Regions:
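Extended charged/polar low-complexity repeat regions
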Residues: 1-498, 503-508, 512-515, 519-533, ...
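A motif-centric feature for acidic-aromatic and gly/ser/thr-rich catalytic loops and repeats
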Residues: 434, 484, 494-500, 648-718, ...
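Short, low-complexity export/processing leader segments characterized by acidic and small residues
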Residues: 524, 668-669, 687-689, 720-730, ...
Length: 856
């Protein structure tokens, strides 16, 4: 085949050598990929679409022994006389060794000398995996090789049963929850139940999913004659439409609320322009490897991105800031990030764990890890430190902070926290007890020191719907009741709020809500006049914003930048609050009432925060240079390594230790002498219900990833803003249906799930199936692609993750023995760090999920 003409007229040209080996491929956009081969037909040089070379070397038995990336990173392998891998060298230079017994893999020894032992049965099914610390996991199979029992390291057993067609018909979880499944003659699941839920499915031609029904809540799916998804109908009967081109690519998307977006694509299928409502647009420019080089908005706002030879980001720039990244030559990990004039440096060990973070603003944070790779100590300079004691599974059982503060954690057999005790100076300053039910539902929480008991109720969709708090003779009840499509109400009869199509909150007892043509909240209008409020020019506001006031014309105004980030909030008193962001969407500044609050970031968490009056800006010595901003009274925030959980605050030479609950939500703060300075309790909306301390804003963090802005009554949640008053976001999910069909919602159960980025994840799918693809999700909310793996070769390998998809894919292909990813498949980053699975591309793309790439 030398020429391929696709349905859109795009032409792909292919050129072969004399041995019919594909040497050159030119895609419809003119980008060329070249491959050179040795005398055995093995690729030895691959030139990618950017003109960069990857080199591969083989031994005399034709085994791949070396892969060298365009940026000079290397992976290598050694083999025994039977051509089995006996060692591999990772990007960091560590050597992983393998031994075999009876023809199967027996031990894996990592670069730290930790030995993992594997035992297989006569059918080559894995029966036992023994970890370096002596713990083990077990699997049992029936005579047909089907898994019938899996036992975790704590002895918890999950049991499986099948019908004669090998369909899973029963799954019994360790907590007693029993799942039952029924299938039609084609092997499609039509009925699924457990101790809580019941779900029914219907199918069309060739097994395409037509509907999913739970408790009379029905979601439907429509297809074209090619069985390509064209429509999703939600529980209220609203439809989400897709218009496709000849290649099945989405070119028009019409949301549940009628909002329309059109996508222009180049010959390679890449989106080059998004035509948005209101004559707004966004254009994209790419390199040969599909990395975005330029993003331009309709108002002229531009973001620019630069990559190294391996396709890893090294520079990002917008009108507000220039970001520059220096990466480790071997691993590609970021070792220095420049954010304008501020610099953050990172040091790593050979396993990729961060061991030190420093900055030119004075941060010096050190981490150490135990033999199993778990965080063991953290230290800030010579002033503050924390240490961890863990059980043999790596779960925390005790944490000790500076000032003699000790946090002890008790857990049940599933690893869930059942009691947390905080002691300082030998006195218990906090004591919390938790009771859990099946499906990881938190049933109750007790503050043992105050006697306050809070009980929780859930519906059959895993929504947290009710909180009942009892203290003495007083009882307080808060409702969080969803309707058919997941819109939340604060009363059992669900009459206190009104919603529009697509989940827009239109009215509550106090306000009317107005939105722009992209679904962003632009005015929260008070129903009653406020004494401190400023009345806006009603006619002018209605004309400029395209709305019609329904009451007082007073309230909160919101303005949005062209890339969808909140730009300004005008308070009811008329004072504006303005925001600035870098090219990665991280908030770098807040301006309010003559004061600037600034942030410097360490990855996705803030490391420094400080404020100054605008009048304090000092001009540079050169008149043409912009004034230098003051950097005084800096607060350094310390987060538990690799998480969004704050652990310390360093300010004005003082150190404060932060205690968080099981979910990572801050609940207490102590000074360096062990005195409690801050104590906070949230309700099921994330609103503060009880507080002790001098200022609530002394610790502004709420749910993981959220920063409370007292000026706006909103929580900044990385890519969006969360309103604790409404229990949801004030703009749509920017990742669309990939975050679920509830585009304004926070997670279903905020007692068990978090949304660190403001991009709703898959917690609500835990224990269920994806509504579009039917892919099952485990109890932790991760997809199980076992039924959609590549069947003609290796489909599950371990690599050292680099943080770059293309580089990870190359490593996975090399490990699996492929010169390129098999057509129709893609590599999925499993939640287990470094594990890659070869999965059907279409299934992977349509199964909106959070995978290992986001986590690690």
């Amino acid at each position: 085949i030398y020429k391929i003409v696709d349905a859109n007229g795009g032409i792909t040209r292919q050129q072969y050598n004399g041995y019919q080996e594909l040497e050159v491929t030119v895609n419809p956009e003119g980008y060329t990929r070249k491959t050179s081969y040795n005398e055995f037909g093995q690729p030895v040089r691959i030139t990618d679409e950017n003109g960069e070379d990857t080199f591969l070397s083989y031994d005399g038995n034709r085994n791949l022994v070396l892969l060298c990336t365009p940026g000079g990173k290397q992976l290598s392998w050694d083999y025994d006389e039977m051509d089995r891998v006996v060692s591999r060298t990772t990007l960091s230079g560590e050597t992983v060794k393998y031994t075999y017994e009876g023809g199967v893999l027996h031990t894996i020894t990592d670069g730290q000398g930790r030995v993992y032992t594997l035992t297989f049965n006569d059918r080559y099914d894995l029966e036992l995996l023994r970890f370096p610390n002596g713990l083990f996991r077990r699997w049992e199979y029936d005579g047909r090789g089907r898994l019938i029992q899996a036992v975790d390291v704590k002895g918890n057993a999950t049991r499986y049963a099948y019908d004669r067609a090998d369909n899973l018909i029963r799954l019994e979880e360790p907590d007693g929850n029993v799942h039952r499944f029924e299938y039609d003659a084609m092997g499609n699941m039509v009925h699924a139940t457990d101790n809580i839920r019941e779900v029914k499915f219907t199918y069309g031609a060739l097994g395409v999913l037509k509907s999913r029904e739970q408790e009379r809540h029905r979601i439907t799916f429509g297809y074209n004659s090619e069985l390509q998804l064209r429509r999703i109908g939600n529980e209220a009967g609203d439809n989400y439409f897709f218009e496709l081109d000849g290649l099945g690519q989405v070119v028009t998307e019409i949301g549940f609320d009628g909002l329309r977006r059109e996508y222009e694509r180049d010959g390679a299928g890449r989106v080059t322009r998004v035509n948005r409502p209101g004559n707004k647009w966004t254009e994209y420019l790419y390199d040969g490897l599909d990395n975005i080089l330029k993003e331009e908005q309709y108002d002229g706002e531009v973001s620019l991105y630069t990559y190294d030879k391996d396709g890893m980001l090294v520079k990002a720039e917008n009108s507000e800031n220039l970001l520059e990244f220096t990466r480790d030559r071997k691993t590609g990990q970021i070792i220095e990030e420049k954010q304008g004039e501020y610099t953050v440096n990172r040091t790593y060990d050979s396993e990729g764990n961060c061991t030190r973070i420093t900055s030119n603003l004075g941060a010096d944070i050190r981490h150490t890890y135990d033999r199993e790779g778990n965080l063991q100590t953290m230290q800030v300079g010579e002033s503050w430190q924390a240490s961890w004691i863990r059980d043999n599974t790596g779960l925390e059982v005790q944490r000790t902070f500076s000032g003699g503060v000790t946090v002890r954690t008790e857990r049940d057999c599933f690893g869930r926290e059942v009691r947390k005790s905080v002691r300082s100076g030998g006195i218990e300053k906090g004591a919390y007890r938790y009771q859990w039910g099946i499906a990881n539902h938190l049933l109750s929480k007790e503050n043992e020191l105050t006697g306050t008991v809070t009980r929780y109720d859930y519906d059959r969709f895993d929504f947290l719907i009710r909180q009942e708090t009892m203290q003495g003779s007083e009882t307080d009840v808060i409702y969080r009741m969803p309707d058919f499509v997941g819109n939340l109400f604060e009363t059992p009869d669900k009459k206190d709020r009104k919603y529009g199509a697509g989940g827009k909150l239109l009215e509550d007892p106090d306000c009317f809500y107005h939105y722009d043509d992209e679904g962003n909240l632009i005015f929260r209008e008070f129903k009653q006049l406020q004494e401190t409020g400023v009345k806006f020019d009603r006619k002018r506001m209605e004309k400029e914003r395209g709305i019609r006031c329904l009451a007082t014309g007073m309230g909160w105004l919101y303005e949005w930048s062209s890339n969808g980030m909140l730009k300004k909030v005008i308070r009811p008193d008329g004072r504006p609050v303005e925001f600035r962001y870098d090219a990665l969407g991280r908030r770098t500044a807040k301006l309010y009432f003559g004061k600037v609050t600034r942030w410097v970031w360490d990855g996705n968490v803030p490391i420094h925060e400080w404020g100054y009056k605008v009048t304090n800006m000092q001009p540079d010595e050169e008149e043409s240079a912009p004034p230098k901003e003051p950097t005084e009274d800096i607060t350094t925030w310390v987060f538990e390594a690799g998480t969004f959980v704050p652990t310390a605050k360093i300010q004005d030479g003082k150190q404060y230790s932060i205690v968080s609950d099981y979910l990572g939500t801050p609940i207490q703060m102590y000074d360096e002498l062990g005195n409690k300075t801050w104590d906070c309790t949230l309700d099921i909306y994330g609103k503060v219900t009880n507080f002790e301390g001098s200022s609530l804003n002394e610790c502004p963090f709420r749910y993981q990833g959220q920063y409370a802005d007292e000026e706006t009554e909103l929580y900044y949640n990385r890519f969006r803003y969360y309103s604790p008053q409404k229990g949801g976001y004030i703009s749509k999910d920017p990742i669309g249906l990939n975050g679920g069909e509830k585009l304004y919602n926070y997670v279903y159960d905020p007692n068990s799930w978090i949304d660190e980025y403001g991009l709703v994840r898959n917690g609500h799918l835990a224990g269920n199936k994806h509504p579009i693809t039917g892919v099952p999700f485990d109890s932790n909310g991760f997809p199980d692609f076992s039924n959609y793996l590549y069947s003609k070769g290796k489909n599950d390998v371990m690599i050292t993750p680099t943080g770059n998809r293309d580089l990870d894919f190359k490593a996975a292909n090399a490990k699996a023995g492929y010169t390129e990813t098999p057509k129709g498949y893609t590599w999925h980053h499993h939640q287990d760090k470094g594990r890659m699975q070869l999965v059907e591309t279409e299934i992977h793309a349509k199964t909106g999920h959070t995978g290992g790439f986001s986590l690690h």
